[in-house]
């Protein structure tokens, strides 16, 4: 009997089972213990393979692939701390709903807790963060193949959102030629190998329950808050709110076109807050809100009803309103709850939104990061997509820009970390094959610098704008101690990214004005390659511009 041959047959059943649940992308890191899984994936023609030497980046690459494909994405890593490096991406997926299937190779039980090399306690190591966890036994012919395939099917059928962690112990030897070991065991699955359906099919439909009193509430004064959603959903929500005559407060990730732009500015005006107090119902579609003033208003508003609609299960209202938590796909929910055409009830807010926009436009000629955030819609590739980093840049775009309705926008706004942003953006581009504009800060770029390796081969033009304000300038907006701010919060690194781009053979520009930036972008969109554009800006100008605009708009 060949242990290595049966390991591979066992792994082949696992990987083939994944294909029956829509898995097409498999992300693989190098490793020895994961050899059975890696070879099974490599030999299965249903998969598109992605490789990366850094497991943390690999997990985020899978996250980006899942964001766009809307299908589960598999990740294969070896044992030990390689597994732990998947934690950040796993946590993000749990908060934003992307489906990740983490196949983690492990030592067999007799090598755990006895001093064996690269052997850690992997079973359950992710605590409550995976949506589902499955610890498989060591491969043995004593367990029928139908148990293995049905167990995988059951776990995937139960996976509504987030990550499934499948821990896979394998004994040595891990290498060797294939022989007939386990062939009969494998063939007992019969014509399943030629089929395309799961062995075990479980029905689990996410149904949208119609709110029977909607006809009553849609005649009231309402407010629509749009959080993270798809581009198609964003367009539908915008039309729905317009028909109702309700003001729409659109997040940067809502893709609604933000018909009342600069919400994070005008929500700081007492007149706007006073008018919003007249709302009898607030309907929030999508979660993960960005704007600070929006979150402050959300925390203090007291409508008669506050509804939150999102296809992710669980509590998504940090203000704990009295109302309804409705688990449904946004498009399906809108179809069940049609709008009734009514005149807009808000008068002051549209006026304030227009005045706030004019204040922002008046400052657009200055070369800086706040102005870049405002101008970003002018630099979007045609029929492309935008990936927005975290920290200051996403807040500036949310507050100062107005993105086109239905234009795809992606970000990691679950745990909102700056780790893995370049890797996630790489996954977004690979899954869509669209021209992609990604914008991050300098610390975010440094944090995930080796992800530039993932950007060496792209299927469409990819532009990475690194806004270099020399540190974490988000802390300039916070009441951090002035004497400790630079050393312990901002942490300026005084670096540039030309050498990093050169190391990975990527095109590089450092424009010093808008004309040079636009020229660099024009050339980049004509070439199916990655271009790194570094915007070196004054350290605190972005934060100061936002604070100045907030003060101006608050007194309108």
Curated annotation (Swiss-Prot):
Q: Which residues form a coiled coil?
A: none
Query: Which chemical reaction does it catalyze?
Result: isochorismate + 2-oxoglutarate + H(+) = 5-enolpyruvoyl-6-hydroxy-2-succinyl-cyclohex-3-ene-1-carboxylate + CO2
Q: What is its EC number?
A: 2.2.1.9
Could you tell me which pathway this protein works in? Answer: Quinol/quinone metabolism; 1,4-dihydroxy-2-naphthoate biosynthesis; 1,4-dihydroxy-2-naphthoate from chorismate: step 2/7; Quinol/quinone metabolism; menaquinone biosynthesis
Q: Give an example GO molecular function.
A: thiamine pyrophosphate binding
Enzyme kind, highest EC tier: transferase
| GO biological process terms on file | menaquinone biosynthetic process
Instruction: List cofactor names only.
Output: Mg(2+); Mn(2+); thiamine diphosphate
The cross-references to InterPro entries, in alphabetical order and at most eight, read:
MenaQ_synth_MenD, MenD_middle, THDP-binding, Thiamin_PyroP_enz_TPP-bd_dom, TPP_enzyme_TPP-bd
Which top-rank group of organisms is this from?
Answer: Bacteria
What's the record's note on cofactor binding? Binds 1 thiamine pyrophosphate per subunit.
Which key words tag this protein in UniProt? Magnesium, Manganese, Menaquinone biosynthesis, Metal-binding, Thiamine pyrophosphate, Transferase
Does ATP-binding appear among the keywords?
no
Task: Tell me the leader sequence span.
Answer: none
Instruction: Give the function comment from the record.
Output: Catalyzes the thiamine diphosphate-dependent decarboxylation of 2-oxoglutarate and the subsequent addition of the resulting succinic semialdehyde-thiamine pyrophosphate anion to isochorismate to yield 2-succinyl-5-enolpyruvyl-6-hydroxy-3-cyclohexene-1-carboxylate (SEPHCHC).
Kindly state the subunit structure of this protein. Answer: Homodimer.
Identify its protein family: Belongs to the TPP enzyme family. MenD subfamily.
Output this protein's name. Answer: 2-succinyl-5-enolpyruvyl-6-hydroxy-3-cyclohexene-1-carboxylate synthase
Q: Which source organism does the UniProt entry give?
A: Salmonella paratyphi B (strain ATCC BAA-1250 / SPB7)
Q: What is the lineage of its organism?
A: Bacteria, Pseudomonadati, Pseudomonadota, Gammaproteobacteria, Enterobacterales
């Amino acid at each position: 009997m060949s242990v290595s041959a049966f390991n591979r047959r066992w792994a082949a059943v696992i990987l083939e089972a994944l294909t029956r649940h829509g898995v097409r992308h498999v992300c693989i890191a190098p490793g020895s213990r994961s050899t059975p899984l890696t070879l099974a994936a490599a030999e299965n023609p249903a998969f598109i393979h992605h490789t990366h030497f850094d497991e943390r980046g690999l997990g985020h690459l899978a996250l980006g692939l899942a964001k766009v494909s809307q299908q589960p994405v598999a990740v294969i890593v070896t044992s030990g701390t390689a597994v732990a490096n998947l934690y950040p991406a796993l946590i993000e997926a749990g908060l934003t709903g992307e489906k990740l299937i983490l196949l983690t190779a492990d030592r067999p039980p007799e090598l755990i807790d006895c001093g064996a090399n690269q052997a850690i306690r992997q079973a359950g190591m992710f605590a409550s963060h995976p949506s589902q966890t499955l610890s498989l036994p060591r491969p043995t012919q004593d367990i029928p193949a139908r148990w293995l395939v049905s167990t995988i099917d059951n776990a995937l059928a139960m996976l509504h959102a987030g990550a499934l962690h499948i821990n896979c112990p394998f004994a040595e030897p891990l290498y060797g030629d294939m022989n007939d070991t386990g062939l009969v065991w494998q063939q007992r699955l019969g014509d399943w190998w030629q089929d395309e359906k799961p062995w075990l099919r479980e029905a689990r439909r996410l149904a949208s329950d119609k709110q029977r009193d909607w006809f009553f509430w849609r005649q009231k004064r309402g407010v629509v808050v749009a959080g993270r959603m798809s581009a198609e959903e964003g367009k539908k929500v915008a039309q729905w709110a317009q028909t109702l005559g309700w003001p729409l407060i659109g997040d940067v990730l809502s893709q609604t076109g933000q018909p009342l732009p600069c919400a994070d500015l005008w929500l700081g005006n007492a007149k706007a807050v006073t008018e919003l107090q007249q709302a009898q119902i607030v309907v929030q579609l999508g979660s993960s809100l960005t704007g600070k003033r929006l979150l402050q208003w959300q925390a203090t508003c007291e409508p008669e009803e506050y509804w939150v609609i999102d296809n992710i299960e669980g509590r998504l209202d940090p203000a704990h309103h009295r109302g309804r938590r409705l688990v449904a796909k946004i498009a399906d929910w809108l179809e069940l709850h049609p709008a009734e055409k009514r005149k807009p009830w808000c008068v002051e807010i549209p006026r304030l939104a227009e005045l706030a926009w004019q204040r922002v436009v008046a400052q657009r000629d200055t070369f800086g990061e706040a102005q870049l955030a405002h101008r970003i819609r002018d630099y979007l590739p045609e029929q492309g997509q935008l990936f927005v980093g975290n920290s200051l840049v996403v807040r500036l775009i949310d507050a100062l820009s107005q993105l086109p309705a239905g234009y795809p926008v992606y970000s990691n706004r679950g745990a909102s970390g700056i780790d893995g942003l370049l890797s996630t953006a790489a996954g977004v581009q690979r899954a869509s094959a669209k021209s992609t504009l990604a914008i991050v800060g300098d610390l975010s770029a440094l944090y995930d610098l080796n992800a530039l390796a993932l950007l060496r081969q792209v299927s469409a033009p990819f532009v990475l704008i690194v806004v270099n304000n020399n540190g974490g300038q988000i802390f300039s907006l916070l009441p951090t101690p002035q004497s400790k701010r630079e050393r312990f919060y901002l942490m300026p690194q005084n670096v540039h990214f030309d050498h990093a781009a050169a190391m990975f053979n990527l095109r590089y520009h450092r424009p010093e004005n808008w004309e040079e930036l636009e020229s660099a972008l024009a050339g980049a969109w004509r070439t199916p390659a990655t271009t790194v554009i570094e915007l070196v800006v004054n350290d605190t100008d972005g934060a100061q511009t936002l604070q100045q605009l907030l003060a101006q708009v608050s007194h309108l």
